[in-house]
Curated annotation (Swiss-Prot):
Residues 19-203 form the FAD-binding PCMH-type domain. InterPro entries: FAD-bd_PCMH, FAD-bd_PCMH-like_sf, FAD-bd_PCMH_sub1, FAD-bd_PCMH_sub2, MurB, MurB_C, MurB_C_sf, Oxid_FAD_bind_N. GO terms for cellular component: cytosol. Pathway: Cell wall biogenesis; peptidoglycan biosynthesis. It comes from Prochlorococcus marinus subsp. pastoris (strain CCMP1986 / NIES-2087 / MED4). The active site is at 166, 217 (proton donor), 287. This is UDP-N-acetylenolpyruvoylglucosamine reductase. Cell wall formation. Pfam families: FAD_binding_4 (PF01565), MurB_C (PF02873). GO terms for biological process: cell division; cell wall organization; peptidoglycan biosynthetic process; regulation of cell shape. It is an enzyme of class 1 (oxidoreductase). Its EC number is 1.3.1.98. It is found in: Cytoplasm.
Length: 296
């Protein structure tokens, strides 16, 4: 099979934004769609478990040896833009901040909010990532996927995808996202779009601990409430377990103070859940995807 290159026993802490992770038995960073598909085929033919990571945000990987193939999509960065129609075709590994700035420079409106999301397009669709009432699903036309069981490649229209708050079926099925078609509003004022994009980024960096390793948001917001607000009301900001700490800037962020391991972080998540449930009667559901754990 052509274009199959991977490394062995790779430390995945280098590929997560929280800087924690175990070792991958096999690891590869495909440069394009063809290489990605070939890797999926190789894993299937060799009976290897296959897991996909993007930017590594919203991801907690246990400090264990992970058998099988781990694919990181961050080199899959192709973007094709039809400026007149607003249709944008992006590979799964395109970073949202990169896409946001490109859209603004092309006068395409509707992606300004994504500048503050430290994830890839594929990961963001899979997790249905968003900010307040916005999510990438709002702009989605279709997703191109490969089935890891049948190896069939297909295109799924948005109407056939059951998106929910911070959830998509891709979290549970065998379909891996290759690329997506998105629609943005053309003929926007470039100067205004760039200004809005920069304001959105500044708001994020002023209120969230971007200078330290973190997941992004740890918990989903409960109905008519905010996880960060609940955590702050209990005086938990700054609370630590090992090298893991609840951010003093934002209650819904856990930061790694250079030596945290996966147990520290999982224990801290559990303590937060217990305290909020005990004091507020609300169970906080993690937004973080967990690999290598029996959770929940």
């Amino acid at each position: 099979m052509k274009n199959i290159t991977f490394k062995e026993k790779i430390n995945l802490s280098n590929y997560t934004t929280i800087k924690v992770g175990g070792f991958a038995e096999y690891f590869s960073k495909p440069n394009n769609t063809d290489e990605f598909i070939n890797l999926i085929n190789w894993a299937s033919l060799n009976n290897q478990k296959c897991r996909i990571i993007g930017a590594g945000s919203n991801l907690l990987i246990n400090n264990i040896f992970l058998k099988g193939l781990t694919i990181c999509t961050k080199k899959m960065r192709s973007i094709k833009i039809e400026s007149h129609s607003g249709i944008v075709e992006v590979e799964a590994g395109v970073m949202l901040p990169t896409m946001s700035n490109i859209l603004a420079k092309k006068g395409l409106q509707g992606g300004e909010w994504t500048v503050g999301i430290p994830g890839t397009v594929g990961g963001s669709i899979c997790m249905n990532a968003g900010s307040k009432q916005l999510s990438l699903a709002n702009n989605l036309l279709s997703v191109r996927v490969i089935d890891t069981k049948t190896l069939k490649i297909s295109e799924i229209e948005k109407k056939d995808i059951n998106f929910q708050y911070r959830f998509s079926p891709f979290q549970q099925n065998n379909l891996m996202i290759i690329s997506a078609k998105l629609l943005f509003e053309p003929k926007g004022n470039i100067e205004q779009l760039l200004e809005t994009t920069q304001k959105n980024l500044k708001k994020k960096t002023d209120t969230q601990p971007y200078h330290l390793p973190s997941f992004g948001s740890v918990f989903k917001n409960p109905t008519n409430n905010y996880a960060g607000k609940l955590i702050e009301e209990l005086g938990l900001k700054g609370f630590k377990i090992g090298g893991a700490e609840i951010s003093t800037m934002h209650g819904n962020f856990i930061v790694n103070n250079s030596f945290a391991n996966s147990k520290d972080i999982l224990d801290l998540i559990t303590v937060i859940q217990q305290k909020v449930l005990q004091k507020k009667g609300i169970f906080l559901e993690p937004e973080v995807r967990m690999i290598g754990f029996d959770y929940p």
